[in-house]
Amino acid sequence: MAKNNVSTFVSAKHNNEKITMLTAYDYSMAKLMDESGINGILVGDSLGMVCLGYKDTLSVTMEDMLHHIKAVTRGAKDALVVGDMPFMSYQTSVYDAVKNAGRIIQEGLAGAVKLEGGVSVYEQVKAIVKAQIPVMGHIGLTPQSVNVFGGFKVQGKDESKAKNIIEDAKRLEEAGAFSIVLEGIPYKLAKIITETVSIPTIGIGAGKYCDGQILVYQDMLGLFSDFKPKFVKSYGNAGEVIRKAFKDYITEVKEGIFPDEEYSFKMDDSIIDKCIKEGV
């Protein structure tokens, strides 16, 4: 499989080829996804919820992100790795945005960065792109704005908000973003945006008309039971499989079944006899 990059994402849209993405936060999972042929891996600030146990993504820091981005880039050889910019790492100033985006590329070795917002982050996106760093936008339901939205709610259902989201998409393209994540918006609105902009749209809860799709892998595999978004399709119940394995392990250890001889190391009995005789 050829190495995925920004150009392959853009070419995919022009060739009507769907783009596949998933989130990953560690080496082993990134390696599995990479071997499966995934186009892109997002190291999302969603790690705050699914890995660190936060109630939202707002507490995630740059150090948290860099720690996980480094792990993922070690495991992904062919997938494009996109590093999320956490809350307040780019909103404060254009300078901070470029500096922190640079850390994700330079220290984390990611191939691109992602940040939330449209019109409001136009200058930040433009400056980051000018610094030769590829940017993936993110509009619609933006989790870092959860307090403004009053929760994780579908966005763009009325005319005014729908028009604002369309304008966000246009401005991100104008600023130089190479793609845009559309999250939690009606599929007809996502279709309009996908047809309006020339850069790829990656949907998560935005219907089938986007140029690509992304899911949080814990959601699709049944590994995160705190809540399950409506738009998530289950591709397996790994949570139940893992839970059963843990229970079986606990039972076998308590009952003396594991480890048996098959899982133990052996040595010559004569050596043991000598140790006993010598009082060791």
UniProtKB/Swiss-Prot annotation:
Enzyme class: transferase
Pfam family, one: Pantoate_transf
Requisite cofactors: Mg(2+)
Gene Ontology cellular-component annotations: cytoplasm
Gene Ontology terms: biological process: pantothenate biosynthetic process
Molecular function GO labels: 3-methyl-2-oxobutanoate hydroxymethyltransferase activity; magnesium ion binding
Keyword check for Magnesium: yes
Functional description taken from the UniProt entry: Catalyzes the reversible reaction in which hydroxymethyl group from 5,10-methylenetetrahydrofolate is transferred onto alpha-ketoisovalerate to form ketopantoate.
Protein name, as recorded: 3-methyl-2-oxobutanoate hydroxymethyltransferase
Species: Clostridium kluyveri (strain ATCC 8527 / DSM 555 / NBRC 12016 / NCIMB 10680 / K1)
